[in-house]
Amino acid sequence: MRRSINDRSLIVSVNPTSTISEVYRLLRTKIHYLSKDHESKLIMVTSALAGEGKTTTICNLATTYALEGKKVLLIDADLRKPSLHRIFSLPNNHGLSTLLSGGTSAHSAIQETMVGYLSLLPSGPVPMNPSELIDSTAMRELLESLKQDYDVILIDTPPVLAVTDPVITSTLCDGVVMVVATGRVKKDHLRKAKEQLEHVNARMLGIVLNRMNREDQQIFYMDDYGTKG
């Protein structure tokens, strides 16, 4: 059964003609352009620190792909502080954690959202060993299998500087997008996050500079990560 969504977080769904919704569509186009020479079917969205807007970004980005008619799967790989199930008003009894530990099947864990063509694999209950689950053969096999069923898979992770999970996840993805809250994150934080991802040869698609306007809506600018100091 499909349920309601968080109007504030999913502006692309509730107000697709708004200026901010158009900016999210431009972000989707930019990602497509930056990955045109290399298939980017499995994309991770992360940030250096918490509270930079990565989760709102990935939810709206996923929605733009779905509204384009792409079959999209959104994965909540933040096994420590999950949030995507709340945005889509869906249960979190089963999800990625139970799937990787053998407690459920992908068919049972993946849920439909109110957005057509957009499905969600929530995090599931917080496990005792999140890093071990992410860095497992089961995770690798799961993602390879899911790539056969979806046009686009977007993965939300914890902040890079918080835990090792996103660095591990980046090695399993075709590309990584970093969300940066301008005026909040220091250059040293961004540099350290970049170095950690580059150390494992993560393929950086670009950074999204997240700013706030008078209505507290997010505005984005995306550039090739390599152009940033």
Question: What is each PLM-predicted segment?
Answer:
Residues 1-229:
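P-loop NTP-binding module
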